[in-house]
Amino acid sequence: MKNTSTLLFAAFLSTFVPSLAAMPVADKAMFRAHLGFLADDLLEGRETGSRGYDISALYVASQFQKYGVQPKGDKGTYLQQVPLRKGYLQLDSPTMSLQGKNGDQPLVYMDEFLMGPSLLEDRSTKTAPLVFVGYGIQAERFAHDDYADIDVKGKIVVTLSGKPSRFPTEEGAHFSSGAHKREMADKYGAVGMISLQTPLSEKTSPFIKGREYRFMPSMDWINAKGEPANAVASLQNTASLSLTAAQKLFTEVDVSLDEIYALAEANKPLPRMDLKLSASMAKKSTISPLLSSNVVGFIEGSDPKLKNEVVVFSAHLDHLGMVKEKTGDNIFNGAMDNATGVATLIEMARMFNELPVRPKRSLLFIALTGEEKGLLGADYFARNPTVPLPSIVANVNLDMPILTYDFSSVVAFGAEHSSLKDVTAEAAKKAGLQLIPDPIPEQGLFTRSDHYMFVKQGVPSIYLWTGNTSFNQAEDATKIRAEFLQTHYHQVSDDLKLPINYDAAARFVQMNFQLALEIANAEKRPVWNEGDFFGDTFKK
């Protein structure tokens, strides 16, 4: 008996024009070879700026060259250099204490609070009063202002993680991001920030998980002024608190944190208040410069006019590297995250090289650095593109497609904000797949991968992922995906020993190849939907 997914894949191939014989087909053996190289222990986890990352970047560049993809990096090469600064936290240095009417109360690093390094100061210290500002969000579109009628100048703001539940999922992901909250705190003169875990955030991102990153550096790219592009000078003293420690901030006021949690759960307005406590924070950081590179390849379109419009396909090449302090397996290979995405780009490059007629619009393939450090390579490219920014009409981002099951659907985060939804649905249909809504909206994935840096430059963008359904009725796709996210995501076990389904991998490549054709050959360029929040917020 033939497998159902095999029959659907064959039906998908028959939809191609002009003929099946002339149309490239994804090769699972080629995909497997690329994945095997990129996720090998010899690359030591491909951390941004590392030897392993540089080797992987040269590998991608060599594959682009092999398949006739033109270089579009710096000075006629495939590499766009990204100047960086990295900082390590000196692990014996973080201290934090609360001061109130009962004197000084120290908190315990890693048990009660976590800090990251500074990229601006070797030594960072701050003592200031604490003020609670709800979620720390200002969103005029949703009639929400946590900074109304409260003075935070010269104070440390205390915020709940997350957002009001009434906010739409993807708009809410924008407002709940650390970048937005830091921007608001800086705007109103705060000198520090403390983020509090909530019962919801503890389920989706447990406080204890943060400990695992203590050996890893923070990074930012360096702008023309020689400064970290995204650092907020006034907020070098920030911390996150555990659920238990967070309770201690409300001992001097009439409202308990549990009552605030209850208000948040009921979607009611949160109080804003002086907490009648001060906090002292201190740390030391070791700071140094670093270089890494995006790998950029270009396929010129065939239409005399439309070739001046560019469709970007991106996938981050970096992962978490290795932790020398860890015994046993200490390499974060990042097989799913995101060697799969980059292997997809390379295999797409091969397929486009075999295409008899190039698509009408041009294509840009980018293997990005620094995603795990804060979407840095994408941010740098989007603000320093190697093609004119107005020429970029769309971005499709590939990040950690979970390929351990026989997926029968895809998710396109952000598709409902632009005309890309219909294009993606059509490509999925031709691939014998279903386009489904976000199955895990609580994760706020729309702002957590590289496509969002293109969104912030006004480019309609989506993040394409495998869905939570399977052609194999014996598989529980939802369970398989959840198990990967809970057990293997950002763990050393995300490696080649996973039960990777290479037929599914070929299907994912073919889906993206079809999507690239649909966008590049469409009569009209993608546009934001009328009145869309992201289109209106970031229009150029």
Regions found by a protein language model. Give the residues of each.
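Second-shell loop/turn segments in exported
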Residues: M23-P24, D41-R51, L120-E121, F132, ...
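Acidic/histidine-rich catalytic neighborhood of metal-dependent amide-processing enzymes
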Residues: H174-H180, S201, G321, T327-S419
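N-terminal hydrophobic or amphipathic helices/low-complexity stretches enriched
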Residues: L20-G73, A245, N308-V310, N529
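Extracellular/luminal Protease-associated
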Residues: Y109-A229, E300, N330-N333, D337, ...
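Noncatalytic luminal/extracellular "stalk/propeptide" segments of secretory-pathway proteins
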Residues: E44-P164, S292
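Soluble metallo-hydrolase cores and metallopeptidase-like ectodomains found primarily
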Residues: K101-N102, E112-D145, D149, P228-G334, ...
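His/Asp/Glu-rich mid-to-C-terminal helical/loop segments that flank catalytic regions of hydrolases
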Residues: R350, E354, N468-F538
